[in-house]
Swiss-Prot record:
Consequence when changing I68N: In LYNCH2; decreased mismatch repair activity
Stated consequence of mutating V185L: In LYNCH2; uncertain significance
Effect noted on mutating R69K: In LYNCH2; decreased mismatch repair activity
NCBIfam families noted in UniProt: mutl
Effect of T117M: In LYNCH2; decreased mismatch repair activity; no effect on MLH1 splicing; fails to interact with PMS2 and EXO1; loss of nuclear localization
Low complexity: bias regions: 362-375
Effect of R472I: In CRC; uncertain significance
Protein name: DNA mismatch repair protein Mlh1
Protein family according to the UniProt entry: Belongs to the DNA mismatch repair MutL/HexB family.
Gene name per UniProt: MLH1
Result of altering K443Q: In LYNCH2; uncertain significance; no decrease in mismatch repair activity; no effect on nuclear localization
Mutagenesis or variant effect for K241Q: Abolishes acetylation
Species of the source: Homo sapiens (Human)
Ranges of compositional bias, category Polar residues: 443-457
Effect of C77R: In LYNCH2; decreased mismatch repair activity; loss of nuclear localization; normal interaction with PMS2
Length: 756
């Protein structure tokens, strides 16, 4: 038998590239991982993934990142082409995900790749197709959004053995969901979505404003999210920092869920997982495991990222010392959280006057059983199919209103100083012009009959932005100026500096609101999903599995009352475009049947003169505490700004002026502020008599599909009910007086219809 030496031949370049591609791209999930990392390197804030047949037939990933320059499209799919690395020494300080320039090249050698991309300075997008790393044809201009869309078709079409090994699309799709879910947890603040082609509902979806815990809840369920412990430690000697979330002793699953990111790379570490599970062995039942999400940031020069083709392994210095430090920190956190067990109770809402549905904590719980992840299966009749945090495009499409005045109204910025008083007084920097009194009068005269007219609507244009919107500088004996970070979003309290009120009467009114508040109702309003308006007085909202009918009039009235009390003396001003004579407004009110005027009360002119003189005496207090401004001639020139972008129905202005003079208790301080705030809240509330329901005439909708909805409906949904989420503590009597009614409950509907 003769031994003949074999001939060494140089492999064909296509064979070499295909072998290398098989190492880097082992399955569809690896391809998606590489492309997601490219999206993150491109500073994307939204990443959408669409797959077909587990990614073997189609993978489409789209981002809104920086895009790819047209000049780079020729070589973008060639091996060892990258924008993130220039020299080997750069690996010591690499901070991006990609560095070898192999991902797209490897994919193009085992699939058909099409790239559509547009940069910020590009006039249009460009589309190019690739095969074996080469451009098939010159890039073609096309329409497209900012960012990049990569389409991968027929993955492993030229590797028959690999395609046969990956014959289970469901398994591959599950691994894709796992990869995207893990990246979405680590990259809170970036929106991720994954769905099958042709499906309308995404299987993984995170919101751009969601926190890490929110994303864990969305991906792994409520059972783990409510049992999390936040961890974090830093060791400058070892040059590392760690943060993350781990489950406490209440939670356990049959298989360990371990999310490990080292310098923001999704990696695996068997030694670290075993070290942590050793700690949990003392707390969890046998054969059960914890949930772990850890993010380690180690000095880049101490990490070697170039040790595996798929980059799922890294090596780093001082590994044993770092593992020991992490193990000690987790053990200390678990030791401090093992003194209690948590149970949850649920009651009907809003059946009781007192708070319910609260978490019950027991301190004698070392012997209680652990919560199992498998026991939290959500059945169809218990599934909540809405998310209160979702936003609608309608919120950004504010309907154009028909102004009462022929003159265009605008938001103007004023900066005044009171020189005569010897102290600078920067007042009402953000003002809103309102219609002239003549139009208000004409509008109200048309309201005297039975015909209901629409609310006064305004066309608003934003003027120059002030550096300190609605800031009011005052120096009084009973107030002081402080920085305030609370209640920032909607009310007049969102000022850089606000006045702290030391008036006992106001503090007492605030305390009464707190004592009468219903926490469960507040939670319901905070997390509700708005369904729609029945009419100006009633609206539908969903909370969890229940549908509620809400009295918009009463809720908005309570909302404005609480804003007036809590933000007392901290309001901006809605400036009228022309001064409104109080005499004319009072006469309009007395002419209205709603005033209840009779001849026995005396001549209307005399009563109107009395109202003008009376309110002029109170003008200084009204302007200081309520931003209700009356000039020396007896003209109304400003109203308080309670909620941004909200203007009260001016048809109610005459009655409001009349009731200020007749229904407010001006003798006692507390009663004065309370009654004045209630009258003002009534004027600002959504009232049916001041809104025209053209859309419900004869029971038919007048709105054309695709048209802008009625402005009052937009205001109710996107201004009033948005404010209800965070600026109201509903009183307990709302559970009994019919202002909040439960109409339906999903489990009860299932008993009747046996389906959803």
């Amino acid at each position: 038998m003769s031994f003949v030496a074999g001939v060494i031949r140089r492999l064909d370049e296509t064979v070499v590239n295909r072998i290398a591609a098989g190492e880097v791209i082992q399955r569809p999930a690896n391809a998606i991982k590489e492309m997601i990392e490219n999206c993150l390197d491109a500073k994307s804030t939204s990443i959408q993934v669409i797959v077909k047949e587990g990614g073997l037939k189609l993978i489409q990933i789209q981002d809104n990142g920086t895009g790819i320059r047209k000049e780079d499209l020729d070589i973008v799919c060639e091996r060892f082409t990258t924008s993130k690395l220039q020299s080997f020494e750069d690996l010591a300080s690499i901070s991006t995900y990609g560095f070898r320039g192999e991902a797209l090249a490897s994919i193009s050698h085992v699939a058909h790749v099409t790239i559509t991309t547009k940069t910020a300075d590009g006039k249009c997008a460009y589309r190019a197709s690739y095969s074996d790393g080469k451009l098939k044809a010159p890039p073609k201009p096309c329409a497209g959004n900012q960012g990049t869309q990569i389409t991968v078709e027929d993955l492993f079409y030229n590797i028959a053995t690999r395609r046969k090994a990956l014959k289970n699309p469901s398994e591959e799709y599950g691994k894709i969901l796992e990869v995207v879910g893990r990246y979405s947890v680590h990259n809170a603040g970036i929106s991720f979505s994954v769905k099958k082609q042709g499906e309308t509902v995404a299987d993984v979806r995170t919101l751009p404003n969601a926190s890490t815990v929110d994303n864990i809840r969305s991906i792994f369920g409520n059972a783990v999210s409510r049992e999390l412990i936040e961890i974090g430690c830093e060791d400058k000697t070892l040059a590392f920092k760690m943060n993350g979330y781990i489950s406490n002793a209440n939670y356990s699953v049959k298989k360990c869920i371990f999310l490990l990111f080292i310098n923001h790379r999704l990696v695996e570490s068997t030694s670290l997982r075993k070290a942590i599970e050793t700690v949990y062995a003392a707390y969890l039942p046998k054969n059960t495991h914890p949930f772990l999400y850890l993010s380690l940031e180690i000095s880049p020069q101490n990490v070697d990222v170039n040790v595996h083709p798929t980059k799922h392994e890294v090596h780093f210095l001082h590994e044993e010392s770092i593992l020991e430090r992490v193990q000690q920190h987790i053990e200390s956190k678990l030791l401090g959280s093992n003194s209690s067990r948590m149970y949850f109770t649920q009651t009907l809402l809003p059946g009781l006057a007192g708070p319910s549905g609260e978490m019950v904590k027991s301190t004698t719980s070392l012997t209680s059983s652990s919560t199992s992840g498998s026991s939290d299966k959500v059945y169809a009749h218990q599934m909540v199919r809405t998310d209160s945090r979702e936003q609608k495009l309608d919120a950004f499409l504010q309907p154009l209103s028909k102004p009462l005045s022929s003159q265009p109204q605008a938001i103007v910025t004023e900066d005044k100083t009171d020189i005569s008083s010897g102290r600078a007084r920067q007042q009402d920097e953000e003002m809103l012009e309102l219609p002239a009194p003549a139009e208000v009068a004409a509008k109200n005269q048309s309201l005297e009959g039975d015909t209901t007219k629409g609310t006064s609507e305004m066309s608003e244009k934003r003027g120059p932005t002030s550096s300190n919107p609605r800031k009011r500088h005052r120096e009084d004996s009973d107030v002081e100026m402080v920085e305030d970070d609370s209640r920032k979003e909607m009310t007049a309290a969102c000022t850089p500096r606000r006045r702290i009120i030391n008036l006992t009467s106001v503090l007492s009114l605030q305390e009464e609101i707190n004592e009468q508040g219903h926490e469960v109702l507040r939670e319901m309003l905070h997390n509700h999903s708005f369904v729609g308006c029945v009419n100006p007085q009633w609206a539908l909202a969903q909370h969890q599995t229940k549908l509620y009918l809400l009295n918009t009039t009463k809720l908005s009235e309570e909302l404005f009352y609480q804003i007036l009390i809590y933000d007392f003396a901290n309001f901006g001003v809605l400036r009228l475009s022309e001064p409104a004579p109080l005499f004319d407004l009072a006469m309009l009110a007395l002419d209205s049947p709603e005033s209840g005027w009779t001849e026995e009360d005396g001549p209307k002119e005399g009563l109107a003169e009395y109202i003008v003189e009376f309110l002029k005496k109170k003008a200084e207090m009204l302007a200081d505490y309520f931003s209700l401004e009356i000039d020396e001639e007896g003209n109304l020139i400003g109203l308080p700004l309670l909620i941004d972008n909200y203007v009260p129905p001016l048809e109610g202005l005459p009655i409001f002026i009349l009731r200020l003079a007749t229904e407010v208790n001006w003798d006692e301080e507390k009663e004065c502020f309370e009654s004045l705030s209630k009258e003002c809240a009534m004027f600002y509330s959504i009232r049916k008599q001041y809104i025209s329901e053209e859309s419900t005439l004869s029971g038919q909708q007048s709105e054309v599909p695709g048209s802008i909805p009625n402005s009052w409906k937009w205001t109710v949904e996107h201004i009033v009910y948005k404010a209800l989420r965070s600026h109201i503590l509903p009183p307990k009597h709302f559970t009994e007086d019919g202002n909040i009614l439960q109409l339906a409950n999903l489990p009860d509907l299932y008993k009747v219809f046996e389906r959803c």
